[in-house]
Design a protein with these regions (language model features):
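N-terminal active-site segment of His-dependent metallophosphoesterases
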Residues: 1-64, 138
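Extended active-site neighborhood of metal-dependent phosphoesterases/phosphodiesterases
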Residues: 60-138, 168-181, 207, 211, ...
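Divalent metal-coordination and catalytic microenvironments
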Residues: 11, 46, 51, 65, ...
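Acidic/histidine-rich helix-loop elements
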Residues: 10-28, 54-56, 85-101, 160-161, ...
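Binuclear metal-dependent phosphoesterase catalytic core
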Residues: 24, 32, 175, 197-246
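His/acidic metal-ligating clusters that form di-metal
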Residues: 33-46, 114, 124-202, 238-240
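Active-site-proximal beta-strand elements of phosphoester/diester hydrolases
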Residues: 3-16, 112-121, 145-147, 202-207, ...
Length: 246
């Protein structure tokens, strides 16, 4: 494989069948996004970046999400968000062997680099996961990508920064500061698009497929029902990425 074309989708917040989320048909949004990804014609990996469901979704919700992904015939990976249960995701998506200390942790090894999929579902990033990333990066000249639900930075979204930011952000930043070959850190959680520099890393926050929120509000106040997904093109030396809105 000369290059990887990734579709990053995050913050779906899928509810039970025929249920709307704040008046929004989140299932239809997800189906619409997948249709656009299929029509793109170049995507060879989909990454779901967490908050697949809303408030510990049922297995039925997760099975529906899985069925939609399976229909694309595109390879996919999933990571949990704070609204998800890692245990349920592991069961439904056959990831039991990727559980470690109650959290999901796995990676893809490519000819030109490695992708780590991290678990911040409890609000923090387990330090044993980050220690493994640090060790792997320190032993290789290859480049790496990280996918995690919570950004390791503040995102200038008032509600999220004040109430729902990564709990052990300072510890995580301290370790990331000493790693030089992470080419991109891709996150969700903030229901907004952001690109933020952290030391020598670029942290890229992908907008939600549910809705975007007012970045000045103290409550969850929808500012836009426009949904988006991120396309990432990576070959181990160069990386390009942009968000597509629907």
């Amino acid at each position: 494989m000369s290059s990887l074309h990734i579709a990053h989708i995050t913050d779906l917040h899928i509810l039970e069948e025929n249920q709307l989320n704040l008046g929004i048909d989140v299932r239809e949004n997800f189906i619409k996004i997948l249709k656009y990804i299929k029509a793109d014609g170049t995507i060879n990996k989909i990454v779901l970046g967490g908050d697949l469901g809303h408030d510990d979704p049922s297995e039925e919700v997760l099975l529906w999400i899985k069925s939609q992904l399976d229909q694309t015939k595109i390879d996919y990976r999933i990571i949990p968000g704070n609204h998800d249960s890692s245990q349920k995701l592991a069961k439904v998506f056959n990831l039991e062997t990727e559980m470690e200390e109650g959290r999901l942790f796995f990676w893809d090894e490519l000819d030109f680099g490695k992708i780590f999929y991290l678990d911040t579902s409890n609000g923090d990033l387990p330090m044993h996961q980050l220690a493994w990333v640090e060790e792997e990066c320190g032993q290789s000249y290859q480049k790496f990508l990280l996918f995690m639900h919570h950004p390791p930075v503040l995102g200038n979204v008032h509600l999220m920064d004040e109430n729902h930011a990564l709990e052990n952000m300072n510890q995580v930043q301290k370790i990331l500061r000493n790693i030089n070959n992470i080419q991109g850190i891709f996150c969700g959680h903030y229901h907004n698009e952001r690109t933020i520099r952290l030391y020598n890393h670029m942290v890229m926050i992908t907008p939600s497929t549910f809705a975007q929120i007012d970045d000045q509000s103290e409550i969850f106040n929808i500012s836009s029902k426009t949904i988006g997904w991120r396309k990432i093109i990576w070959d181990g030396s160069s990386l390009s990425t942009y968000v597509k809105y629907l």
